[in-house]
Amino acid sequence: MFRQIANKSTKFGLRNYSTGKDIKFGAECRALMLRGVEQLAAAVEVTLGPKGRNVILDQPFGQPKITKDGVTVAKHIEFADRHINLGAQLVKGVASSQNDQSGDGTTTATILTRAIFAEGCKAVAAGMNPMDLWRGINFAVEKVVGELKTISRPISSTEEISQVATISANGDKVIGNLIANAMEKIGKEGVITVQDGKTLKDELEIIEGMKFDQGFISRYFINDAKEQKCEFDDPVILVVDGKISNVQQLVPILELVHSKHKKLVIIADNIEGDALSALIFNKMRGLQVCAVKAPGFGDLKRVNLQDIAVISGAQVISEELGVRLEDVDITMLGSAKKITIDSDSTIILDGAGDKAAIQERVELIRESLTRTTSDYDKTQLETRLAKIGGGVAVIRVGGASEVEVGEKKDRITDALNATKAAVEEGIVPGGGTALLYSTLALKKIKMDNFDQTIGVKIVRDALLIPCKTIANNAGVEGSVVIGRLLSKRDFEYGYNAQKGVYENMIQAGIIDPTKVVRTALIDAASVASLMTTTEAMVVEIKKDTPMPQMPPQMDY
């Protein structure tokens, strides 16, 4: 009997209390998640396209932030109701994942998630099997990804790079040309960084430097909470070939750096135990220090440390070479004009290494390249050569106010990431047309059952949404635009929302990176499918703790 009651409560979505938790089931659970998804997507979708609107964000400190960046808007949204917030958090995860993978397309990923999940909820409410819907959605996504790869073509010119960057920067041709020039000067594999400028104009500077794929060992070293990175001007650099675990090894160098009022970056095989704890403790007390793992493994790690030492003018500290960490003096440390360290990478700008020594190192690597017969070794040598000899392009963002610089910096970062994605996987027609025309590949698909067919239809309908939203944001009826384009059946024909005309998107320079479109669809479908097949949610019950009463006043 008790089991029957429990089953009935589950079926009808009633509350079920356990210690400190609130549990909701079935349709009620999905409806609450959908509310969060729809509200977040509504705030994000207004930014899509060249005629998309700005969103103003309240910040706990400083001035409000104005942005057209979808992921920035999504990250600022938090709902008081924890049930509704669960859905919003999942979509924020989609936007963040999309931003991490390809740097753009976050708004597209968000509205695709909403479209698939909303229709999935309706289908489940109508009695369809959630797992069959999931199979149909996944099959359709695989088919569309294959279609995107078919129509994709490699990016081939500086002009096309400029076009991709311009579109991602909301039609700003100055930004597009700036990024194209940077890539032309340092190569498509080169390092480009974006920094705040000190003038009204945007500037591009090519400086000597290198980047390697290792970040800070602990998040306690972050000194820029907004950007989640550690950034030092004019630091000294300690390069150690070996592990550091004994705090006594570090005491002399920490005292030396503190007495000289210097910022310290330590690059070593690893820093652990008491040594790491001591660094974090001293960081909390005001010492400007950051610890970074050396890049690579084995012999490659050793030569990478030597490359870093040459760039920065440091001496590699190694007991094998007869130099102990306890005996380090200031002359053995390198330096740089600037170092930027995040969780995944480190960029050393304008190191103090001797120019002749750097050139000698470059020639040594080139000589090794001519002798090697191994493809793996050749790849590693080419990577090292690019890091040492290629330099770093720095885009300095100008503007009349902090708000303007911040908004433009977001757009430049988006444009830069989108351009890198285009170089990696090629381009497709933009303006939502690539996804729109991919619906034609789904029309004649035969599935195992009706529910799976509905799953395919859910994806097919969702693929219309990006193009429709771009048109709606431009003040045009999106349904009319979609009808006209589908009747044309020309994969390069689309609606130019900036000019309000129908034309060939490739010839007009309206193009999207294939990687951006592909990952937006995959991420959106993945999370939307999981939410559609969700049958219960568990949230913490928020307890309202009363304010402590004031003590009674004493009578004197």
UniProtKB/Swiss-Prot annotation:
| GO terms classed as biological process | asexual reproduction; defense response to bacterium; mitochondrion organization; positive phototaxis; protein folding; protein refolding; response to heat; sorocarp morphogenesis
Q: Which SUPFAM superfamilies match?
A: GroEL apical domain-like (SSF52029), GroEL equatorial domain-like (SSF48592), GroEL-intermediate domain like (SSF54849)
From the Swiss-Prot or TrEMBL record, state where the protein is found. Answer: Mitochondrion matrix
**Does this entry carry the keyword S-adenosyl-L-methionine?**
no
Q: Which family does it belong to?
A: Belongs to the chaperonin (HSP60) family.
Pfam families documented for this protein: Cpn60_TCP1
Classification via InterPro entries: Chaperonin_Cpn60_CS, Cpn60/GroEL, Cpn60/GroEL/TCP-1, GroEL-like_apical_dom_sf, GROEL-like_equatorial_sf, TCP-1-like_intermed_sf
Keywords of this entry: ATP-binding, Chaperone, Mitochondrion, Nucleotide-binding, Transit peptide
> What is the protein name given in its UniProt record?
60 kDa heat shock protein, mitochondrial
Q: Which PANTHER family match?
A: 60 KDA HEAT SHOCK PROTEIN, MITOCHONDRIAL
Principal cellular location given in the protein's record: mitochondrion
Which molecular function terms from Gene Ontology are attached? ATP binding; ATP-dependent protein folding chaperone; protein-folding chaperone binding
Report the superkingdom from the record.
Eukaryota
Q: Which organism is it from?
A: Dictyostelium discoideum
Q: Which GO terms describe its cellular component?
A: mitochondrial inner membrane; mitochondrial matrix; mitochondrion
